[in-house]
Amino acid sequence: MKVSVLAAVAAFAAATAIAGPVRPAGVGNDKYLIELAPGKTQWVTKNEKHQMKAAGQTFIDITDEFGTGFTASQPVSANYPKNSRHSSIVAPIIANLSKENLMRDLKAMIEFNNRYYESQTGVESATWLMEQVQKAIDASGIQGAKVEKFENQFQQFSIIATIPGSESTVVIGAHQDSINEQDPEGGRAPGADDNGSGSVVVLEALRGVLGSKALQAANNTNTMEFHWYAGEEGGLLGSNAIFKKYKSDGRQIKAMLNQDLAGFVKKGGPEQFGLITDNTNQELNQFCKMIVKKYASIPIVDTKCGYACSDHASADRSGFPASMVAETAFRDSNPHIHSADDVTDYLDFDHMLEHAKVAVGFMTELAMASNL
């Protein structure tokens, strides 16, 4: 990261930041409204968004909120279990999780030139992913289970798989898109870790849950949703659209677990999860720690990633409790992301399998929880 680039971005931000979402005179359709912190917004071009992303600046694109009166919400209340109560269901699911599936699925995802949200290959990769989800649902035979597209104002669509239950809903999500920060629209962006790893973890967790006869027999109390978001690299576009709609519709989203970066272990460093503690729900974070201790074989440490660093922030600002369990402490994250070098050579599939265990434990325990 060059100092000159950072200085230029800082100067640009200082010159163009505005106090609130007020459209300045002369702003055209080529400008996008982004939020860098609560209440701190500015209008930028797509290229400027890319430059800021490359310089390490995180943000959420709120262009479609302009003039709507949208305001961030406080999280809805939820009552999370203090201890695991359904290990007899979770343990067999975990035992059947497949590292080979993770490897196979990720190999397929990185074969697309990129999964950029405004590229044709971004649409093709989303189509492939949705086909895998549909196959898993078809194989399960679970009545009412379904997968749907969530269309966006850009090319790539988001994907939502649902296993029905009560109005209370538990979500596990991951963004499916990738980006090459040097050439966003056409550059090679395999996105093995960012975020092919999280995408295949959520897919394997879905397969595990769908394949559990014990869970089917127990008749899950709460609705389960598995999400794959489009356009995270453009400013949490896909997830923000979904959770804003859920807020508008009065949905009862009781918990959301974000899986973004799930495969990298720093050479010579400790193998551990990173629990994101900023812009997340502290009660749900404590539940995540319990799940990790119960079902995973590696520890978890607190870490921070900044405002709008990933899709949990979309759930959080719409008033839904959210957590993110990342591959490690943020300072030790994969240095190869957002480039052509984000490949599987740097990933640890055993570590990825640990993420899948946590995802299954999180979803199953909360799906069966009464009075969430």
Curated annotation (Swiss-Prot):
Alphabetical GO biological process terms: proteolysis
Pfam families named among the record's database cross-references: Peptidase_M28
Cofactor annotation comment: Binds 2 Zn(2+) ions per subunit.
EC number: 3.4.11.-
Localization (cell): Secreted
GO cellular component term of the entry, any: extracellular region
Positions contributing to Zn(2+) 1 binding: 175, 194, 260
Cofactor(s) needed: Zn(2+)
InterPro entries, A to Z: M28_fam, Peptidase_M28
Glycosylation sites: 96, 195, 219
Residues reported in the UniProt entry to bind Zn(2+) 2: 194, 233, 338
Keywords: Aminopeptidase, Disulfide bond, Glycoprotein, Hydrolase, Metal-binding, Protease, Secreted, Signal, Virulence, Zinc
Coiled-coil ranges per UniProt: none
SS bonds (residue pairs): 305-309
Primary location class: secreted
Gene3D superfamilies: Zn peptidases (3.40.630.10)
Signal peptide: 1-19
Source organism superkingdom: Eukaryota
Alphabetized GO MF terms: aminopeptidase activity; metal ion binding; metalloexopeptidase activity
Family stated for the protein in its record: Belongs to the peptidase M28 family. M28E subfamily.
General function of this protein: Probable extracellular aminopeptidase which contributes to pathogenicity.
Assembly: Monomer.
Protein name as annotated: Probable leucine aminopeptidase MCYG_08380
Organism: Arthroderma otae (strain ATCC MYA-4605 / CBS 113480) (Microsporum canis)
